[in-house]
Amino acid sequence: MGSMIIDGRRVEFTDEPNVLAVIRKAGIDIPTLCYHSELSIYGACRLCTVENEWGKTFASCSEKPKDGMVIYTNTPRLIKYRKQIIELLLASHCRDCTTCIKSGECHLQDLAHRLGVHDVRFENTKEPHPIDDSSPAIVRDPNKCILCGDCVRMCDNVQGVNAIDFAYRGTEAIVSPAFNKPIAQTDCVNCGQCRVVCPTGAISIKTNIDVVWDALADKDTIVIAQIAPAVRVAAGEEFGIPKGENVMGKLVGILHRLGFDEVYDTAYGADLTVMEESKEFMERFNAGENLPLFTSCCPAWVKFCENRYPEFVPHLSSCRSPQQMFGAVVREYYKNPENNAGKKLVSVSIMPCTAKKEEILRPESKTNGRQDIDYVLTTTELISMIKRAGIMFDQVEIESADVPFGIGSGAGVIFGVTGGVTEAVLRKITQGHKRADMEELKSSGVRGDDGIKEIVYDYNGKEIKAAIVSGLANADQLLKKIKSGEIHYDFVEVMACRRGCVMGGGQPLDAGAHTREARMQGLYKADVNTQIKKSDENPMVQSLYEGLLKGKTHELLHRNFAEAEKEKNK
């Protein structure tokens, strides 16, 4: 506890990590380019530089607050200093702003306007670098990189992947994979978190918008869409809807307007995953074999496991992800001439996740050699399509998702938040022993945004020990302990993105603490408002098992990672 003088006003501080946080607490939005509260302090951009009473300047992001400090944030000297920094950054920056995919959301562009930088006095003498579009998930354009280091620290600090780093020195410095390899040839897991923190257009989503428009225009095609749970609590943010509000009904109406023939709910696929994964888990748990069971619905986590811990691949659930279960079932359904009207099917997923773009290409995501899902659009891409079509979001009437795949349980909806898969499985496995008490489950430790959570749940007199992890650096930390025998779990849920899919790499940007919490609570509220709480109580799922899935459960809902690896290596 202490106080400091900021621009002539006394401001008290308690546990703020740096002077920058105290300044913002005082209501002053000091500019930054390289500072993120969840990443390590870098202090490279120097935009947050302030001046003390003796005229000494320092970066406020890397200075601890001290009682009695006197600082100034907006002196003529600092204003000039910040403008020069932006000028120098722009001088070595590709300035095709009007056609840049990040235009309107570019932090560098915003700061140039805010600080009054209208001319750049310096010539750009940098040699252009080739664009790296080798990944199915992201595109890297080094010509738009300002060397802020945010992507490097995200990939290292939070994800523990280290697929990119700084290379070369001085004016030749760039951010690059090792040995300038294409990003697709590295350990990159396609999580897209680098894109989330990139302040410019240097890292962007690899878009499928144009091919989806083409499919919608084809009269000989049935185009169907599935909407993931996390999308419904984020898509409205760009249209003035309160953060975290569930806009599923609006999205269904909008997708119908865009030309999609049928719009379904991925929560239905999540219910199928719960049914199969809970069965698989109980078989292993009762036999005491191949434990822990790791969830496998996050493709970025699956790839991380394959790259770093191949010995744990046999412990991955054989269940397909909700997206892929849904895709296989829907494609089987539309094989029936009564359902396809003689037209070909194009299956599109609306996802919060860039890694889903890679998942649909994996060998184990195909049925009889054919992709079950044709294209993945992220939440951000869907927002772009809505804007291009000129649809006024607030004026679209709410519509229900189409049957037979448009009904999902509350358990399926909470898949989009960390701990949701574990909670959904626990709701299911207590059936026949002790009916799941929702309040008891909520307070068991499955909820909350801690990176690593541990719960012990009583199942018919036996203890189920489970871990819930979000963020791959946290997963790495936990896996090392499991591998060494230091700890043991029966069930481990892993999501690559911190807090789960609500914070996926394909979600809208500018997600501060309030946004993160609002999205998580939005899914929990959607669960509360859903009449069906458990996956096994979904009547549409029950009828599927009695009909289309008879004799085809393993073929359509499961995968073999070992066989898929052989196929990839052919």
Feature roles, as predicted:
Residues V197-I203:
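Charged, low-complexity hinge/linker segments at coiled-coil and domain boundaries
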Residues M1-M4:
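Short structural boundary motif marking the start of a folded domain
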Residues I6-R9, E53-W54:
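Short strand-turn-strand beta-turns centered on an Asx-Gly dipeptide
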Residues N162, R195, L382-I386:
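Mobile "lid/hinge" segments at catalytic clefts and subdomain interfaces of large enzymes
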Residues R46-N190, I203-I222:
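Fe-S ferredoxin-like electron-transfer domains
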Residues R9-P17:
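Short, contiguous acidic and Ser/Thr-rich linear segments
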Residues E16-G68, N74-L78, K206-K570:
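Iron-sulfur-associated redox domains of electron-transfer enzymes in respiratory
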